[in-house]
């Protein structure tokens, strides 16, 4: 455990969940939804101390009376005021630290607009007065966490999915592919196919229930067509879910139809390739000499790779695309939900990393654009 008084803070700001903690720890201290909620009703009880906004778990627990908004969409911050609230909440309520005393490592999806990381840098230095900060690419951190220096990372979270091939520690930027199809789109898809059974999830609070159903009951079918046949001929795949008011609902083939969209984006009306093909295309954009190593080191990371059966399905799909002689290994570490954060914790505590930080002095000399020069 690093000395907490000066330890770097690692914040993985996902589109769905924010993971935060101290560098050198093996797991994040705080994991909470990246949500800002505002009351949608008039407050009538005087002296209740009602707030005009709630963040994270508190917003989640009061969701019945709030309108919930996610300030990060597809890995890009769309509402900076709310984003500041989330960071403020992270520092002062979750970690209980003074940001002006700690260097901060933030994470970002690859191929994000440049303005996004400039603004992140600006807020860290100007609003929170951090002494130093750094922005790291999410997939690279996941590879650190898996203990590899070579591999292709398929990182799929709530807002964005991307494949990043890395060879001997070098990211190959020309081969990075990004797919704006992730957990939130799957939740939307589940909401849609549940209406066929007559279940309606309309409010922002009810969407959270759909997300919970997705996380608890959905799985990836090894053979989608076969699974569909099984589900029509018997009730073996049906499960029931208890709503917060005690009502029971039944869910059948929706359990695997929802995550199937990862492999067949056409289900969502998207003209994109599935995650298996995206991974394969990413590998094919690399030099012919390094492909073999990438095939045998495919690493899954992020919450949307937590579906049961996803590793087996990836293995099967990539095997059918790749040359027959190639050995394909899909690594799905059990802690992959947090592997970006864990990688950040490893990186920020390396002695060799200490000269990589962007210091406040450098920022004041050069301005927000320094982030492109010092961070990959």
From Swiss-Prot:
InterPro entries recorded: Actin, Actin/actin-like_CS, Actin_CS, ATPase_NBD
E.C. number: 3.6.4.-
A GO MF term: hydrolase activity
Pfam families assigned to the protein according to its UniProt record, in alphabetical order: Actin
Cellular compartments annotated: Cytoplasm, Cytoskeleton
Source taxon at top rank: Eukaryota
Keyword Ribosomal protein: no
UniProt keyword annotation of Hydrolase present: yes
Broad class of the protein's primary localization: cytoplasm
Catalytic activity: ATP + H2O = ADP + phosphate + H(+)
Class of the enzyme per the UniProt entry, highest EC level: hydrolase
Entry keyword set: ATP-binding, Cytoplasm, Cytoskeleton, Hydrolase, Nucleotide-binding
GO CC annotations on file: cytoplasm; cytoskeleton
Gene3D superfamilies: 3.30.420.40, Actin, Chain A, domain 4
Function in brief: Actins are highly conserved proteins that are involved in various types of cell motility and are ubiquitously expressed in all eukaryotic cells.
Family: Belongs to the actin family.
Protein name according to UniProt: Actin-2
């Amino acid at each position: 455990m690093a000395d907490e008084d000066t330890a770097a803070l690692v914040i993985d700001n996902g589109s769905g969940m924010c993971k935060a903690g101290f560098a050198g720890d093996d797991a994040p201290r705080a994991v909470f939804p990246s949500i800002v909620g505002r009351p949608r009703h008039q407050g009538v009880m005087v002296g209740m101390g009602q707030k005009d906004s709630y963040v994270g778990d508190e917003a989640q627990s009061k969701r019945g009376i709030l309108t919930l908004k996610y300030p990060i969409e597809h890995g890009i911050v769309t509402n900076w005021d709310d984003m500041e609230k989330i960071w403020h909440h992270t520092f002062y309520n979750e970690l209980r630290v003074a940001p002006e005393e700690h260097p901060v490592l933030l994470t970002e999806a690859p191929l994000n607009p440049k303005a996004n990381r400039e603004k992140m840098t600006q807020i860290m230095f100007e609003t929170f007065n951090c002494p130093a900060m750094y922005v790291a690419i999410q997939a690279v951190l996941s590879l650190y966490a898996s203990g590899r220096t070579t591999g292709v990372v398929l990182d799929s979270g709530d807002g964005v999915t991307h494949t990043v091939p890395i060879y001997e520690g070098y990211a190959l930027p020309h081969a990075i592919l990004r797919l704006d199809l992730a957990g939130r789109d799957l939740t939307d898809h589940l909401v849609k196919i549940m209406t066929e059974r007559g279940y309606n999830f309309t409010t922002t609070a009810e969407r959270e229930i759909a997300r919970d159903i997705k996380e608890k009951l959905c799985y990836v079918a090894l053979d989608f067509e076969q699974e569909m046949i099984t589900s029509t001929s018997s009730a073996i795949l049906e499960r029931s879910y208890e709503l917060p008011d005690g009502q029971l609902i039944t869910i059948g083939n929706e359990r695997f139809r929802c995550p199937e969209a990862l492999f067949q984006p056409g289900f969502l009306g998207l003209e994109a390739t599935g995650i298996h093909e995206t991974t394969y295309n990413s590998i094919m954009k690399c030099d012919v000499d390094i492909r073999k190593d990438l095939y045998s080191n495919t690493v899954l990371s992020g919450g949307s790779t937590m579906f049961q059966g996803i590793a087996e399905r990836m293995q099967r799909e990539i095997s059918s695309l790749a040359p027959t002689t190639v050995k394909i290994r899909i690594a799905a570490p059990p802690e992959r939900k947090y592997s970006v954060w864990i990688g950040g914790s490893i990186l920020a505590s390396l002695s060799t990393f200490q000269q990589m930080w962007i210091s406040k002095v450098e920022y004041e000399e050069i301005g927000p654009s320094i982030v492109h020069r010092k961070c990959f």
